[in-house]
Amino acid sequence: MATVISMIPYPFLPANNGGQKGIALFNQYFSQHVRLIGITVEQNDNTLAGYNTIPLFSASRLRYINPFYIHRICRIIRKEKASHLMIEHPYMGWMALIITMLTGIKLIVHSHNIEALRFKTTGKWWWKVLWLYEGFIHRKADNSFFISDADRDYAIKHYHISTANSLVATFGIEWDQPPSEEERKIAAWNVRQKHNISPEEQLLLFVGAFKYPPNFEAYCIIRDKICPALNDIGMRYKMLICGGGLEKEQPSDPNIIIAGFVDDIHLYFKAADVFVNPVLDGGGIKTKVVEALGNNLSVVSTFNGSIGIDKNICGGKLTIVEEDDWALFAHQIREATIGQSHIPVEFFQHFNWKYITAKAAKIVISDAQPDKD
């Protein structure tokens, strides 16, 4: 079995947000196909990993530029006879390249966004420097795993990486079929009781970590644009906003409910009638949209909020609206509440972790096999 060393230089266990889930669940399912050893930070609860971990990295920000880790990681690679070194994002790429030169190990970059573009959309002046560095690391890697076809196509065109050395390993979900109608009814009853929502009101949902600027901007659009448009068309609804970072918000519209961080977000996905996703900026696939669709929940989204998700495998559950047409957005929300479509099996074949990691492991296992004369 091929041995992969995964460098994960930040806390991700327990996995509370989409980015953390993307790392935790990819590695958990990937470890069913390869022998995986995670080199992680000391703050993680590594008992939750499901594979061997080594808490090597400190909490200091200097860990990203600390050359003293190189020797220790090289020792681990030689001891474990590893064939591949995988990094999350490009930030430790410089270190990984030195390690590959010293050990001969092959390098995988597990990309979650085109990072430079993500920082460009959030107004960081130094995004171009990151763009040059990110492209360099991807070109030097033996393989790059991208979160979406859009990211992979961008890297091929602008970073000039090899098509043969890249593949899409998207964000996934653990279940392979939607919840039953009975499960959804029970969830809806519980959530409506908790938040005092009447059966006559449509339950609309948005989820995010609101300290992240694109998510906070989306919340402001819901508060200032979408809810007034829903009120104008006379829709009866409650807009549930789940996630941390809005503790100081006190919206004047009684239809908006700030639920804050919730222990079981899947209960809310099952309970809702429509998932609303007016995200305008930020890179990568929107994990909350994948989770919503996987719960057979109708989604109304902007184009940016649906990047990486093929409408053709969503069975009519995904509606995409042009940015800034919030009156049409509100109309589509109302239309989605009367839809009777169901998420098809093709969606789960694309977004289930078992399928995603099996495809990635096939590349690694093939690379790890010795050449035959």
Positions of predicted regions on the chain:
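N-terminal subdomain of nucleotide-sugar transferases
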Residues: 1-46, 80
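Active-site proximal beta-strand in glycosyltransferases
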Residues: 5, 100-119
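Conserved catalytic-core segment of nucleotide-activated headgroup transferases in glycan assembly
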Residues: 22-23, 28, 173-252, 258, ...
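Membrane-proximal helix-turn-helix segments that form the acceptor-binding/catalytic region
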Residues: 71-75, 101, 125-147
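Carbohydrate-associated surface elements
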Residues: 150, 169-172
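Acidic donor-binding loop of glycosyltransferase active sites
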Residues: 267-284, 297
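Short hydrophobic beta-strand element within catalytic cores of glycosyltransferases
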Residues: 288-291, 298-303
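A charged, aromatic-enriched C-terminal amphipathic alpha-helix characteristic of glycosyltransferases
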Residues: 338-367
